[in-house]
Amino acid sequence: MNKIQDLVRNFENHISKVNSENPDFFQVVAELAKTYGYPLSNAAVFNKNLLKLKNLKYILVADNPGMTEQEEECYLVGKAGKMARNFFANSSLANNFDEEVAVLNKTFIHTKSTLDLKKLKEFKNLFVESQVFMANLAVDMLEASDCELWITGCSELTEKGLFAQYLKTLKERCAENPALKEKIFFYPHFSFGNFSKNLNVVRTSHPEMSVKEALKAATLNIL
């Protein structure tokens, strides 16, 4: 876990650096948040729950920090987060979610809606750099542990999608280490029950499968 802890600390330091070096960035994101009627706490968001990791079993990637996430500095803590936690608990995949599941995002930049990231046009370079950083962080964690990487929310994870750079970085890392592909899985987002709906299609067709077997069969063809 020492390597994982080093990666988490580096992530925390990187977020502090981004926020301190880009005051204009905070102001623009704050103005966007204001249109939705809430004050901004953090434009670039670290996940404090990563500091609780003790026995890493899964790396779970969502899209970007939303309103509650930026306020609490924790990833996946809204409705989708509750669905994710319930799934891991009910499927006996994790006894203690915060200690066993590292939750990351495809970018650390906050917007209320993921598609609002398109409105931050003047910070396109930072958005691209954030995707590279987060993709490398996920793969670095994967290489430093004996776990699986689950990437949820794939509608914008295409060559021309919002998270094209994240996908490109993943492909580059997998080209360097092809064995990684066996440990990376892609699923719909937990929001609106899409993750469970996708999995249930497989489980209905193959009732003989265990949850873990069904999860492997349900992965989307992205890489």
Model-derived regions, located:
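Glycine-rich anion-binding loop/nest that anchors nucleotide
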Residues: 60-64, 105, 148-156
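Short, surface-exposed acidic-centric catalytic microdomains
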Residues: 81-119
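Short acidic (Asp/Glu) patches
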Residues: 40-46, 77-90, 129-135
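Short, well-ordered alpha-helix to beta-strand connector turns
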Residues: 55-56, 98, 145-147
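Conserved beta-strand scaffold positions in the cores of enzyme catalytic domains, especially
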Residues: 60, 101-103, 183-186
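A structural preference for long, well-packed, hydrophobic secondary-structure segments
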Residues: 35-37, 68, 72, 91-95, ...
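Glycine/proline-rich loop-helix segments at beta-alpha junctions forming the active-site rim
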Residues: 2-6, 10, 111-223
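Active-site and ligand/interface coordination hotspots across diverse enzymes
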Residues: 1-77, 206, 210-223
